């Protein structure tokens, strides 16, 4: 493994860890997970930062680049949005207004720019965003191909804890796995990865490169990522932000509840981004040192070698005993009868 120095970004150290594949008999894919902080409440500046990071990854030959959960729009760590049981504050509502303003429409101009970036640097891009759909927000992952096309999205189906007051719930219509020249790529966000039925649905779609954007920097997260790699016989790419208090607006504009003693340099999210092989081997990371590009060459032959032992939806399945139904249609709270239906019911 080599450490490749890169320019300083936002006064933080940044480097790439590269694990070079040694098996030339099967295809390899160079993948990079980005560990960096959002520029909070400044979506245009965050997009500029994303492009700098994407360009840097591409310069090292990355073919697939994965960004953290909520990189565009921001993960509002430490905020309560003024909520307690039976009460909401005016300050919290204003905080939500600002957060809503930082989110992006899908499709929309920011999506167009991300697509153009993917095409410019010839990479497949997996980007964590906060999606705005009217006045409901979703924690979403967007997928782009190396030709600059937007492929689609995954909406987080189960926000965690207080996330549920600011994010809506995705439905079964956005659990995609894309068949690409690099392999079959999909994503689950943060603690969705602890949902065994969601994972099983993705395994059934043949996922080979399993992307796990997250906001969880605890050591125990690594155990989950290793388990998924072994269970699914897939590569796991987990990208997390590395944030200090100074990466968020200063108080009183932004307050970390219960941690008012933080200094500007206090670490509030320590990263831990990692790349793991289908055999459970750590290929790169976890990194807890600062902003970084963490890369590895993925030997796609490892997938078949792992599946020889364990194929969770194939030869190791028992569908006559255990099975799963996935309701993968879009769900809307309001349905309107069509014009044709109205015409059929009209008097002649």
Curated annotation (Swiss-Prot):
User: Does the keyword field hold Hydrolase?
Assistant: yes
**Signals that turn on the gene:** Not induced by abscisic acid or by 1-aminocyclopropane-1-carboxylic acid (ACC).
* Annotated protein name in UniProt: Bifunctional nitrilase/nitrile hydratase NIT4B
The record's listing under Pfam families reads: CN_hydrolase
Taxonomically, what lineage is the organism?
Eukaryota, Viridiplantae, Streptophyta, Embryophyta, Tracheophyta
* Tissues in which the protein is found: Expressed in roots, stems, cotyledons, leaves and flowers.
UniProt keywords (A-Z) are:
Hydrolase
UniProt similarity note: Belongs to the carbon-nitrogen hydrolase superfamily. Nitrilase family.
Keyword hit for rRNA-binding: no
Q: Gene3D superfamilies, alphabetically?
A: Carbon-nitrogen hydrolase
Summary of the function given for this chain in its UniProt record: Highly specific for beta-cyano-L-alanine (Ala(CN)). Low activity with 3-phenylpropionitrile (PPN). Not associated with auxin production but may be involved in cyanide detoxification.
State the active site: 69, 156, 190
Q: Which InterPro entries match?
A: C-N_Hydrolase, C-N_Hydrolase_sf, Nitrilase/CN_hydratase_CS, Nitrilases_CHs
Catalytic activity, reaction form: a nitrile + 2 H2O = a carboxylate + NH4(+); 3-cyano-L-alanine + 2 H2O = L-aspartate + NH4(+)
Query: PROSITE patterns, alphabetically?
Result: CN_HYDROLASE, NITRIL_CHT_1, NITRIL_CHT_2
What Enzyme Commission number(s) apply to this enzyme?
3.5.5.1, 3.5.5.4
Example GO BP: detoxification of nitrogen compound
Q: Which organism is it from?
A: Nicotiana tabacum
Q: Name one GO molecular function term.
A: nitrilase activity
Q: Which residues form the CN hydrolase domain?
A: 29-300
């Amino acid at each position: 493994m080599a450490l490749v120095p890169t320019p300083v970004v936002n006064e933080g150290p940044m480097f790439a860890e590269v694990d070079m594949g040694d098996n030339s008999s099967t295809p390899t894919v160079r993948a990079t997970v980005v560990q960096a902080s959002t520029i909070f409440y400044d979506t245009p500046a965050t997009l500029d930062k994303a492009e700098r990071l994407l360009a840097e990854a591409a310069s090292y030959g990355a073919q697939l680049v994965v960004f953290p959960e909520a990189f565009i729009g921001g993960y509002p760590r430490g905020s309560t949005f003024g909520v307690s049981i039976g009460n909401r504050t005016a300050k919290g509502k204003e905080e939500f207004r600002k957060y809503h303003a930082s989110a992006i429409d899908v499709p929309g101009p920011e999506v167009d720019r991300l697509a153009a970036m993917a095409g410019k640097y010839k990479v497949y891009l997996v980007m964590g965003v906060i999606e705005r759909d009217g006045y409901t927000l979703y924690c979403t992952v967007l997928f782009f191909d190396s030709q600059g096309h937007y492929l689609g999205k995954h909406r987080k189906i189960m926000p965690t804890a207080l996330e549920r007051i600011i994010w809506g719930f995705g439905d079964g219509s956005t659990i995609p796995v894309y068949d690409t020249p690099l392999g079959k790529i999909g994503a689950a966000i943060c603690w969705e990865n602890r949902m065994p039925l969601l994972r099983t649905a993705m395994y059934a779609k043949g996922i080979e490169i399993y992307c796990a954007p997250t906001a969880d920097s605890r050591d125990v997260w690594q155990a989950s990522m290793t388990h998924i790699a072994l269970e699914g016989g897939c590569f796991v790419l987990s990208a997390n932000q590395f944030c200090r208090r100074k990466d968020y607006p200063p108080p009183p504009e932004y307050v970390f509840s219960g941690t008012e003693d933080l200094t500007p340099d206090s670490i509030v999210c320590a990263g831990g981004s990692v790349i793991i092989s289908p055999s459970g081997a750590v290929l790169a990371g976890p990194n807890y040192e600062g902003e970084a590009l963490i890369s590895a060459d993925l030997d796609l032959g490892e997938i078949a070698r792992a599946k020889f032992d364990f194929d969770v939806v194939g030869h190791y399945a028992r569908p006559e005993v255990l099975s799963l139904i996935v309701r993968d249609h879009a769900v809307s709270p309001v349905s309107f009868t069509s014009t044709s239906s109205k015409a059929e019911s009209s008097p002649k």
